[in-house]
UniProtKB/Swiss-Prot annotation:
Species per Swiss-Prot/TrEMBL record: Trypanosoma brucei brucei
Subunit structure: Homodimer. Only the dimer is catalytically active, as the active sites are constructed of residues from both monomers.
Name the record gives this protein: Ornithine decarboxylase
Needed co-factor(s): pyridoxal 5'-phosphate
EC top class, as a word: lyase
Single GO MF descriptor: ornithine decarboxylase activity
Keywords tagged on the record: Decarboxylase, Lyase, Polyamine biosynthesis, Pyridoxal phosphate
GO terms under cellular component: cytoplasm
Regulation: Inhibited by antizyme (AZ) in response to polyamine levels. AZ inhibits the assembly of the functional homodimer by binding to ODC monomers and targeting them for ubiquitin-independent proteolytic destruction by the 26S proteasome.
A Gene Ontology biological process term: putrescine biosynthetic process from arginine, via ornithine
Length: 423
């Protein structure tokens, strides 16, 4: 195993570390006064996810959703693996093109785009983009008339944790009119896309969306369009404790594709996985910078049923304005793990964990049983790769954590590609 540690804009490769070892090594290099928060990212985990994807969804080409985590090393790893990229803005297109990704491996998958961003996509050679209404077609007709448009349809995402169809997607009953207007505008519609939302607990939503896509596909073909792209969107789980497993979703998708889109050399099937690739690859380490004892409470929670003399409030140096913005915007539920080795029969106390800012909203964990922690000790949070680093701010002057990289089982060609990437 290797660990890659970024030092300003350079990287150095060390031998013999996994994620946990890297965390402990980095922490041992800090004193309590210097314990800034940091991530350890296992790029090898991303590679293993890719291998699982190819095994479970062999007909579907992944176009990684850049919005989920736009870290340079993540993008470089995925580019070396040959994935495509789902971009939502000119900046994301620029970022991906900047590491050498060709425009044909980019889909501009934002149904509602700023005109200047459409122009940037055109000038960058990015032709494939999504839309869901006639007004978007009119913008494209004026700005990028040679674009290859993919019609996004709405889905039943009522069981998803993060719902998207309330904002994006044309209703199936409206698609014929939209396609007819595209024909009048001489816009080339090449396929259909959808997104079932993130955190869904019902894999059958993919089956229904694929069935609806077939209906719209045939509608487009009837109107004279060369329909050859099916984009099944995102919503694939990436954490260890996901209630709906990726393999189960893949099985439903494969059955639906076999029924509605049997193998065809002219057909391209893509998806937009984000959290699937990166969620479990990142672990965040935060330092306990302050603590308070709170009045005792009577608890009755399974094995912890007892009258506790005290509970604790812990303050750490990252919060909801930083990496834990996922709690506010992605409905994440995080669990703190003490970095130190557990002590046998150590008493656990009801605890809350708070971020470092002056805002009372900055609470990371409302209630969790932990051993008593001391100022200067560390808490770890696993599965922190999705919608974390991309949403950080510098509110109150707190900066984003540094990312250190573990490389476990990475192929040589990926390592070479990473070394050639600029930070």
């Amino acid at each position: 195993m290797d660990i890659v540690v970024n030092d300003d804009l350079s990287c150095r490769f060390l031998e013999g570390f996994n994620t946990r070892d890297a965390l402990c090594k980095k922490i041992s290099m800090n004193t309590c006064d210097e314990g800034d928060p940091f991530f350890v990212a296992d790029l090898g985990d991303i590679v293993r996810k890719h291998e699982t994807w190819k095994k479970c969804l062999p007909r579907v080409t992944p176009f990684y959703a850049v919005k989920c985590n736009d870290d340079w090393r993540v993008l470089g790893t995925l580019a070396a693996l040959g994935t495509g990229f789902d971009c939502a803005s000119n900046t994301e297109i620029q970022r991906v093109r900047g590491i050498g990704v060709p425009p044909e491996k980019i889909i501009y998958a934002n149904p509602c785009k700023q005109i200047s961003h459409i122009r940037y996509a055109r000038d960058s050679g990015v032709d494939v983009m999504t839309f869901d209404c006639v007004d978007e077609l009119e913008k494209v007709a004026k700005t990028h008339p040679k674009a290859k448009m993919v019609l996004r349809i709405s889905t039943d995402d009522s069981l998803a944790r993060c719902r998207l169809s309330v904002k994006f997607g044309a209703k199936v009953e409206d698609c014929r009119f939209i396609l007819e207007q595209a024909k009048k505008l001489n816009i080339d519609v090449t396929g259909v896309s959808f997104h079932v939302g993130s955190g869904s607990t019902d894999a059958s939503t993919f089956a229904q969306a694929i069935s609806d896509s077939r209906f719209v596909f045939d509608m487009g073909t009837e109107l004279g369009f060369n329909m050859h792209i099916l984009d099944i969107g995102g919503g694939f789980p990436g954490t260890r404790d996901a209630p709906l497993k990726f393999e189960e979703i893949a099985g439903v998708i494969n059955n639906a594709l076999e029924k509605h889109f049997p193998p065809d050399l002219k057909l391209t099937i893509v998806a937009e996985p984000g959290r699937y690739y990166v969620a479990s690859a990142f672990t965040l380490a935060v330092n306990v910078i302050a603590k308070k004892v709170t009045p005792g409470v009577q608890t009755d929670v399974g094995a912890h049923a007892e009258s506790n003399a005290q509970s604790f409030m812990y303050y750490v140096n990252d919060g909801v304005y930083g990496s834990f913005n996922c709690i506010l915007y992605d409905h994440a539920v995080v669990r703190p793990l003490p970095q130190r080795e557990p002590i046998p029969n150590e008493k656990l106390y009801p605890s809350s964990v708070w971020g470092p800012t002056c805002d009372g909203l900055d609470q990371i964990v409302e209630r969790y049983y932990l051993p008593e922690m001391q100022v200067g000790e560390w808490l770890l949070f696993e599965d922190m790769g999705a919608y974390t680093v991309v949403g950080t701010s510098s509110f109150n002057g707190f900066q984003s954590p540094t990312i250190y990289y573990v490389v476990s089982g990475l192929p040589d060609h990926v390592v070479r590609e990473l070394k050639s990437q600029k930070s």
